[in-house]
């Protein structure tokens, strides 16, 4: 076995056998000598030495039964009746393909994906193998692009399909990643939900046949996240094998898991085939989004930590990826649409007095001829409402940013809310350009929340958004943008329109975030409707959910952490009774849950907060700022889950292992009963730790015996600091 070009010692090639190695993972496949097909040999713990190759099966004298083998890139029409990774409608109308191995290329580092978000790294971080396939009958070629991040136990794959023939074809289905795992009992874990209850984990047995999920909303959606985990039934948070797959894409997607008749399990992630049908004329190429695949032999927690580190280090491009985030106050749940210059200056002064560092003006600030005083009008008219802001934004923003923050040498920062991808029919923009809204022929345009979707596949729409955002951000001292989206895509001119939209959207994001690198951008889609790796490429944080109830947020944020780092989560203290659930919870619980997010803030009107709670907020802000660096960059350990325990617990360990913060909660009262111990994980068993100043205690004691706390009421919470001696 030889190392080609010395590429990070991560990619080994021996003839037509390929081995991709991470620190604790190996991904192996080979070319079948008889068929030229790629066959998967292993995806799991690291292996050394010769990799045994399974021969083509022999069944009653028939050889090469393709539905009985592990295939690396299964096409359609040649006897593999399982889910294909590729389906091409050829010029003649059929969907048969015959892609065979041609050659390979090795690359230092990792190439960009044209027009798509993608992981990145230098040649010290990542190595790339490109496997070239060709269909000799249609002259269609496929490049399978594998990038290995050894320190993260991650394999990243995308696919490029090129029509080198003379007739047009159509790509009907294309998966970014597909893998066949050997026969064994497995379970699949996914994140399901809806508006205000995103990212609830669902774990179920992989049965014979096909099971899956996806989104046809045009976006990744509240309903299902583009993430999949596979694990053995015995796998826990800390023990056992787990495979994680995360699609770096914001559009409609499909994930399928199929256990075939022979017991092999195939996982396929990629475009949703109902919204593709991508035409390829001769010479044209379609490139899939990439999919990140990680392997862990330390349970689901190990899988999550690999994804978290990779996304923080090699996906999020923003300078704020691991930078401390300013504590913010957002006006939405405090004022809703009832904002003007007077109310914003008032709330700014009250925020600064509490120690808030950033004031965000949410919806309701724009619209001239069609004022944005409700959700019925104004979207698309991105100029300040002259009745509410008679002097424009700049004088008000100057006054706000001149305010000194209490207990700080800093001035208050200012941020603003926008929803650039949408338009109200009651707007000057729609009156001038109704053709800019997505539509399907003469069919009526379905409104949701009184709004339509602009067609970001159109160059003129892209330029409109880039230009007005450039003007807005240049008009005043704006340090933060909350970019929202509040409906899905219904009518489109063709199935391909949703991916064309994505390409236009990514172009807009890339242009604006490159043009304004000092702005902190936050993604939002009615909460977590676009909480996906594609958004994280450009926006380092996302509003996790419109549900700000502390108890619900424990489920939502811990569910989201299966795939996404806490650094990406926006979480706020809101007023009680909560506006979504009607529940009343203590301020301490609301604050402690919000501190588990990378972007901590408040979502209320300070003038409506009781004097008792207002007196506590500065202390809680100080605690949040102490916690924030560890939450942003530390390794996260889910010690107990809210679905399984009345006492959910989460732990973060700083990168240098010197600091630990524990979040511990009680959901229901515990009457006349002993309390469980919470056992920490990931500590140095031989080291000594101080726990909130007490001790020291050994790491072994803290992990094996644990800590015990009691709560007097339901909705109890505690934040505990440990320091390594």
From Swiss-Prot:
Active site: 484, 546
GO biological process: polysaccharide catabolic process
Entry keywords, A to Z: Carbohydrate metabolism, Glycoprotein, Glycosidase, Hydrolase, Magnesium, NAD, Polysaccharide degradation, Secreted
InterPro entries per the UniProt record, alphabetical: Aldolase_TIM (IPR013785), Alpga-gal_N_sf (IPR038417), Alpha-glycosidase_related (IPR050985), Glyco_hydro_36 (IPR002252), Glyco_hydro_36_C (IPR031705), Glyco_hydro_36_N (IPR031704), Glyco_hydro_b (IPR013780), Glycoside_hydrolase_SF (IPR017853)
EC number: 3.2.1.22
Keyword Ligase assigned: no
GO terms under cellular component: extracellular region
Annotated glycosylation sites: 407, 490, 672
GO molecular function terms listed in the Swiss-Prot or TrEMBL record: alpha-galactosidase activity
Principal location listed in the UniProt entry: secreted
Catalytic activity: Hydrolysis of terminal, non-reducing alpha-D-galactose residues in alpha-D-galactosides, including galactose oligosaccharides, galactomannans and galactolipids
Subcellular location as annotated: Secreted
Domain of life per record: Eukaryota
Entry annotated with the keyword Glycoprotein: yes
Subunit structure: Homotetramer.
Role: Hydrolyzes a variety of simple alpha-D-galactoside as well as more complex molecules such as oligosaccharides and polysaccharides.
Protein name (record): Probable alpha-galactosidase G
Organism in which the protein naturally occurs: Aspergillus terreus (strain NIH 2624 / FGSC A1156)
Source species taxonomy: Eukaryota, Fungi, Dikarya, Ascomycota, Pezizomycotina
């Amino acid at each position: 076995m030889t190392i080609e070009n010395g590429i990070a010692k991560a990619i080994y090639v021996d003839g037509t056998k390929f081995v991709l190695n991470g620190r604790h993972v190996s991904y192996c496949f080979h070319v079948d000598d008889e068929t030229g097909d790629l066959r998967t040999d292993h995806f799991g713990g690291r292996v050394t030495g010769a990799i045994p190759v399974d021969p083509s099966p022999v069944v009653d004298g028939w050889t090469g039964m393709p539905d009985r083998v592990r295939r690396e890139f299964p096409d359609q029409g040649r006897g593999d009746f399982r889910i294909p990774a590729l389906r091409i409608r050829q010029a003649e109308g059929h969907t048969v393909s015959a892609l065979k191995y041609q050659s390979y290329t090795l690359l230092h580092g990792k190439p960009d994906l044209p027009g798509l978000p993608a992981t990145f790294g230098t040649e010290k971080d990542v190595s790339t193998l490109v496997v070239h396939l060709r269909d000799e009958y249609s002259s269609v070629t496929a490049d399978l692009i594998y990038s290995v991040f050894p320190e993260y136990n991650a394999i990243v794959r995308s696919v490029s399909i090129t029509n080198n023939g003379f007739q047009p074809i159509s790509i009907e289905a294309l998966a970014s990643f597909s893998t066949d795992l050997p026969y064994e009992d497995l379970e699949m874990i996914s994140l399901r939900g809806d508006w205000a209850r995103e990212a609830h984990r669902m774990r179920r047995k992989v049965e014979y046949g096909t099971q899956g999920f996806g989104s046809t909303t045009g976006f990744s959606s509240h309903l299902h996240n583009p993430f999949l985990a596979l694990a053995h039934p015995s796998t826990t948070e800390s023990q056992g094998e787990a495979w994680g797959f995360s699609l770096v894409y914001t559009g409609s997607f499909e994930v399928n898991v199929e256990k075939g008749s022979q017991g092999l399990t195939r996982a396929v992630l990629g475009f949703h085939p109902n919204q593709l049908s991508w035409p390829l004329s001769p010479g044209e190429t379609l490139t899939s989004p990439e999919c990140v695949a990680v392997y862990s032999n330390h349970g689901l927690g190990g899988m999550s930590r690999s994804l978290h580190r990779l996304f923080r280090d090699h996906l999020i491009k923003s300078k704020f990826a691991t930078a401390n985030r300013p504590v913010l106050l957002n006006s939405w749940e405090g004022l809703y649409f009832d904002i003007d210059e007077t109310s914003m200056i008032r709330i700014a002064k009250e925020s600064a007095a509490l120690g808030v560092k950033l004031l965000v003006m949410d919806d309701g600030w724009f619209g001239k001829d069609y004022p944005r005083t409700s959700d019925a009008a104004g979207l698309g008219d991105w100029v300040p409402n002259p009745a509410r802001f008679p002097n424009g934004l700049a004088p008000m923003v100057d006054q706000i940013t001149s305010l000194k923050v209490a207990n700080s040498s800093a001035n208050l920062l200012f941020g603003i809310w926008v929803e650039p991808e949408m338009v109200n029919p009651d707007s000057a923009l729609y009156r001038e350009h109704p053709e800019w809204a997505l539509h399907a022929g003469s069919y009526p345009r379905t409104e949701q929340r009184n709004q339509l979707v602009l067609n970001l596949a159109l160059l003129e729409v892209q330029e409109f958004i880039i230009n007005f955002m450039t003007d807005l951000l240049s008009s005043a001292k704006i340090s933060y943008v909350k970019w929202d989206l509040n409906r899905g895509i219904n009518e489109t001119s063709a199935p391909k329109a949703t991916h064309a939209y994505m390409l236009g959207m990514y172009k807009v994001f890339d242009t604006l975030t490159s043009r304004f690198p000092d702005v902190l951008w936050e993604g939002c889609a009615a909460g977590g409707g676009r909480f996906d790796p594609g958004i994280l490429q450009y926006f380092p944080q996302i509003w996790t959910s419109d549900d700000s109830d502390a108890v619900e947020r424990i489920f939502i944020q811990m569910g989201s952490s299966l795939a996404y780092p806490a650094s990406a989560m926006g979480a706020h203290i809101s007023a009680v009774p909560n506006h979504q659930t009607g529940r009343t919870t203590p301020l301490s619980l609301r604050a402690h849950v919000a501190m588990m997010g990378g972007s901590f803030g408040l979502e209320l009107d300070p003038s409506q907060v009781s004097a008792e709670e207002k007196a506590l907020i500065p202390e809680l802000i100080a605690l949040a700022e102490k916690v924030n660096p560890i939450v942003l960059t530390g390794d996260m350990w889910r010690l107990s889950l809210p679905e399984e325990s009345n006492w959910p617990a989460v732990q973060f360990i700083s990168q240098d292992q010197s600091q630990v913060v524990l979040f511990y909660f009680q959901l229901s009262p515990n009457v006349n009963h002993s309390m469980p111990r919470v056992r920490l994980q990931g500590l140095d068993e031989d080291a000594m730790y101080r726990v909130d100043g007490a001790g020291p205690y050994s790491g072994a004691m803290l992990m094996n015996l644990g800590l015990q706390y009691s709560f007097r009421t339901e909705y109890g919470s505690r934040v505990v600091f440990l320091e390594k001696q």
